[in-house]
Amino acid sequence: MSARPEPQPGSERNATEPLPSHLDPTTYPRTLTTTHGPTSIPLHLELTYHTLSPTTALQHVSSPSSGANILFLGTTRDTFDDRPVARLSYTSYPALALKSLHKISSEAVEKFGLNGVYIAHRLGEVPVGEASIVVAVGAGHRGEAWRGAEWVLEVVKERVEVWKREEFVDGGMEWRENRERDGFGKLKTKKEDSR
């Protein structure tokens, strides 16, 4: 992925102009809470500038029919490729991202027989040690829940319109797509990344 272009002279925003709604933190969280299928499986999808709550995520997917509830928190590490990280910053195309999250969660319900799906992604600055994504799923049994949660996470990183800027302690920064690396942190080859 190429770096984002630098603003052209004269294109800077006037501080008194309002931000577009997709960049204005006061218009968030952007949420979609809905159900899937004839049995009304609960789906909660969220983009937010606020701290993520694991408890809230588990409350959304827990049910009497769920014998297994899986929770994943993705947190900001203090290094990336041996460079000390100051923070991450995320941006998104919210309307498209929520549409993608809805499609992914609906696919997961069908594919793994899940009883509930909760996906929340932070936007803006996320300091070291704080969560940038939470995925929670409920299912009748642990096998479906484990596989479903991992599948949801990997597909979210691959498909959803959220971009990450890594800001380093030395002052440098890099824009990245989440799909550039696999679940073990290894760079994907072009062949692996062709979709």
UniProtKB/Swiss-Prot annotation:
CDD domains: MoaE (cd00756). It holds the Pfam family MoaE. Its main location: cytoplasm. Substrate binds at residues 141-142, 157, 164-166. GO terms for cellular component: cytosol; molybdopterin synthase complex. Changing residue 148 to D: In cnxH604; impairs molybdopterin biosynthesis. It is found in: Cytoplasm. Residues 1-37 are annotated as: Disordered. It is an enzyme of class 2 (transferase). Belongs to the MoaE family. MOCS2B subfamily. HAMAP family: MOC2B. Catalytic subunit of the molybdopterin synthase complex, a complex that catalyzes the conversion of precursor Z into molybdopterin. Acts by mediating the incorporation of 2 sulfur atoms from thiocarboxylated MOCS2A into precursor Z to generate a dithiolene group. This is Molybdopterin synthase catalytic subunit. It comes from Emericella nidulans (strain FGSC A4 / ATCC 38163 / CBS 112.46 / NRRL 194 / M139) (Aspergillus nidulans). The gene is cnxH.
